């Protein structure tokens, strides 16, 4: 993946404040999926990458600055993800550009990001007043973080996942301890990860050990969640599986990949760290 060094993440960048769609940079999904032995035509999951951008501003027709929150939903079936720093630079390019309306801004973002991702996407813009009423994600299910264990493995170990013997059940596990690293800058990424499943009971202690083993693992947010989905399917074989990552923001943007073989994307509710 040496080509990633040539993306905006891999080099210093100038900040442009006039609308410039060419700043957007695609990253092929197939690169990481090859390592997981996934074929685009037969993915074992569906879902979306939900992006929240908190630093969007443009000028109205009178030259007055307008600010808004931006939500983007990029289906996991698109051939590309959007390199996150390039999206930040692209959104910054709206700052001193005049637009007729909020919908004109929304339409421009939807068109440009869809072209970069290689498929249809959805964009929503919200005023700060509208955003203020959005609920925060509520903890539901079993949080594994308070299990008292000794830890030795901080390198990727999918074999740590274990299933209890017994009848099929439906459960939800979550952890706020997920940490991984950007494959370009090696900066740490932090997330809450939620797993919902129907199948043999996943051992909460083993799930916690597995989450901790990703602590020094490299991958973009989307790749980490797909890796977790594949590992859980391989090690535990649940009939239904959902993996949802809520990553903390960087550069005014948070990315929240959702992968499932049975559910549609959950509501876009920020966690306490977002």
Curated annotation (Swiss-Prot):
Residues forming the catalytic site: 182 (thioimide intermediate), 189 (proton donor)
EC number: 1.7.1.13
Signal peptide, first to last residue: none
UniProt pathway annotation: tRNA modification; tRNA-queuosine biosynthesis
Example of a GO MF term: preQ1 synthase activity
Catalysed reaction equations from the record: 7-aminomethyl-7-carbaguanine + 2 NADP(+) = 7-cyano-7-deazaguanine + 2 NADPH + 3 H(+)
Binding site for substrate: 82-84, 221-222
Subcellular location: Cytoplasm
Domain of life: Bacteria
Residues annotated for NADPH binding in this entry: 84-85, 250-251
This protein's UniProt keywords: Cytoplasm, NADP, Oxidoreductase, Queuosine biosynthesis
Pfam families: QueF, QueF_N
GO biological process: queuosine biosynthetic process; tRNA modification
A cellular-component GO term for this protein: cytoplasm
Description of how the protein assembles with itself and partners: Homodimer.
NCBIfam families: QueF
Family: Belongs to the GTP cyclohydrolase I family. QueF type 2 subfamily.
Summary of the function given for this chain in its UniProt record: Catalyzes the NADPH-dependent reduction of 7-cyano-7-deazaguanine (preQ0) to 7-aminomethyl-7-deazaguanine (preQ1).
Stated name of the protein: NADPH-dependent 7-cyano-7-deazaguanine reductase
Protein's organism: Alcanivorax borkumensis (strain ATCC 700651 / DSM 11573 / NCIMB 13689 / SK2)
Gene label: queF
């Amino acid at each position: 993946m040496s080509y990633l060094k040539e993306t905006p993440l891999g080099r210093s960048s100038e900040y442009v404040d006039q609308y410039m769609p060419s700043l957007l940079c695609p990253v092929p999904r197939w690169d990481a999926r090859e390592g997981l032995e996934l074929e685009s035509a037969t993915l074992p999951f569906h879902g979306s990458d939900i992006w929240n951008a908190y630093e969007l501003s443009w000028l109205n027709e009178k030259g007055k600055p307008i600010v808004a929150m931006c939500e983007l939903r990029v289906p996991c079936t698109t051939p590309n993800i959007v390199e996150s720093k390039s999206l930040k630079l692209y959104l910054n390019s709206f700052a001193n550009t005049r637009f007729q309306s909020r919908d004109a801004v929304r339409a421009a973002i939807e068109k440009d990001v869809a072209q970069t991702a290689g498929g249809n996407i959805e964009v929503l813009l919200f005023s700060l007043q509208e955003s203020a009423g959005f609920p925060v994600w509520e903890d539901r299910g079993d949080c594994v973080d308070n299990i008292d264990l000794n830890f030795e493995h901080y390198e990727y170990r999918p074999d740590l996942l274990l299933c209890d013997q017994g009848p099929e059940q439906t459960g939800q596990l979550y952890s706020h301890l997920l940490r991984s690293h950007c494959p370009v800058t090696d900066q740490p990424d932090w997330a809450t990860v939620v797993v919902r499943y129907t199948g043999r009971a996943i051992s909460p202690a083993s799930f916690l050990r597995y989450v901790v083993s990703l602590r020094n693992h490299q991958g973009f947010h989307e790749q980490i969640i797909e890796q977790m989905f594949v590992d859980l399917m391989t090690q535990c074989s649940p009939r239904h599986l959902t993996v949802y990552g809520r990553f903390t923001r960087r550069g005014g943007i948070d990315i929240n990949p959702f992968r499932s073989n049975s559910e549609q994307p959950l509501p876009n509710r920020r966690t306490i760290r977002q």
